UniProtKB/Swiss-Prot annotation:
Top class in the EC scheme: oxidoreductase
Role this protein plays: Catalyzes the reversible oxidation of malate to oxaloacetate.
Annotated family: Belongs to the LDH/MDH superfamily. MDH type 1 family.
Reaction catalysed by this enzyme: (S)-malate + NAD(+) = oxaloacetate + NADH + H(+)
BP GO annotations: tricarboxylic acid cycle
Gene3D superfamilies: NAD(P)-binding Rossmann-like Domain
Record's GO cellular component terms: cytoplasm
Name of the protein in its database record: Malate dehydrogenase
UniProt subunit comment: Homodimer.
Lineage: Bacteria, Pseudomonadati, Pseudomonadota, Gammaproteobacteria, Enterobacterales
Length: 114
């Protein structure tokens, strides 16, 4: 599955589905990631904004931390057994936020968060 809050995501999924493989891709958009998470064994979070000129790491953190927190809360409810990879910057803090969210939900497994 491919998920983003942007409404173009289903179209991107259709484009990706033209790659000649047996993999089926579905696109989901909107505030609720639950439909995209159903059945997922691995979730890769690459959400958030990229660092712009004049933006320091704390500015980046202030934007991306909330996005990661929200997504991980949805993962904890929908697919608590999934492995979660986070590449959202600043990674050293967004992974820590994800760990705390998972601990609060009672589903933290250090071997499944990277």
């Amino acid at each position: 599955s491919l998920y983003d809050i942007a409404p173009v995501t289903p179209g991107v999924a259709v484009d990706l589905s033209h790659i000649p493989t047996d993999v089926k891709i579905k696109g989901f958009s909107g505030e609720d990631a639950t439909p995209a998470l159903e059945g997922a064994d691995v979730v890769l979070i690459s959400a958030g904004v990229a660092r712009k000129p004049g933006m320091d790491r704390s500015d980046l953190f202030n934007v991306n931390a909330g996005i990661v927190k929200n997504l991980v809360q949805q993962i904890a409810k929908t697919r608590p057994q999934a492995c979660i990879g986070i590449i959202t910057n600043p990674v050293n803090t967004t992974v820590a936020i994800a760990a705390e969210v998972l601990k609060k939900a009672g589903v933290y497994d250090k071997n499944k968060l990277f």
